[in-house]
C-alpha cells in the first residue's frame, strides 16, 4: 500500500469511528442495501452450488470405487463356489466397467457443462466485491467531506477560501460516490436476473448426466440377475427371502462346529 493509500485508510477508519460516536452523519441508501443483500444471498448460494457440484463428481467416483472393492471382496469370499455359476466374477466385471467406463466418460462432460460454467460464474464475485468495497470507501469520503463543510459553516474559518475549497472537494467526493453507487444499484439486479438463464443449460446437463449414470448403472446391474436362480427373485418378490435366509442360518447353527464353544 502506498503512503497516499495508507493515509486514506487511516482517515476512513477515523470517519467510521466518528460515525459510531455520532460526530459524523452516515448516509443511508436503502435501495443499495436491498440490492446488496440480494447479491450476497445469490453469492452464497452460487458458492455452495460450486462446492456441491464438485462434491457430486467426487461422490460418483467414491461410490463406484467402493462398489469395486465390495465386488472384489465378494468374489474372494465366494472363491471356487462362485466360479461354478460365474456370478461373483461377473458382478465384479460389471462394477469395474461401471467405474472404468461410465464414470470416466461422464467426468469430461460434467466438468465442461456443469462445473466449469458454475466456476466461471463464481469467478466474477471478487471483482464485484471489490467494486462494493470501493463504493463503501467513497461513501466514507463523501460523508467525511460533508461533515467538514458543515463544521466550517457552523464555525467559519479565518481563511475565507477554505469553505469554497472544501465545498468543491465535497462535491467531487459526492459525484464519485454517486457514480459508483448508481452503477451498482443498476447492475446488481441485472446480474441477479441473469443467474437463471445462465445456469439453466448446466442444470439441464446435470439432469441428463444423472439420468445416464442411473440408466447405465441399472442396465449393467440388471444383467447380473440372470446368474441368480429364478426362485431367489420370486422369493424376494413374495417376501419369502427372509425365511429362506433364516433356514440357512439355522443349518449353520446345527453344525457341530458352531456349538464347540458352548460345549466347553
UniProtKB/Swiss-Prot annotation:
Predominant location: cytoplasm
Pfam family, one: BAR
Database matches in InterPro entries: AH/BAR_dom_sf, BAR_dom, BIN3/RVS161-like, Rvs161/Hob3_BAR
Keyword vocabulary terms for this entry: Cell cycle, Cell division, Coiled coil, Cytoplasm, Cytoskeleton, Septation
Location of the protein in the cell: Cytoplasm, Cytoskeleton
Residues of the BAR domain: 17-237
Gene Ontology CC, one term: actin cortical patch
CDD domains: BAR_Rvs161p (cd07591)
Protein name according to UniProt: Protein hob3
Gene symbol of the encoding locus: hob3
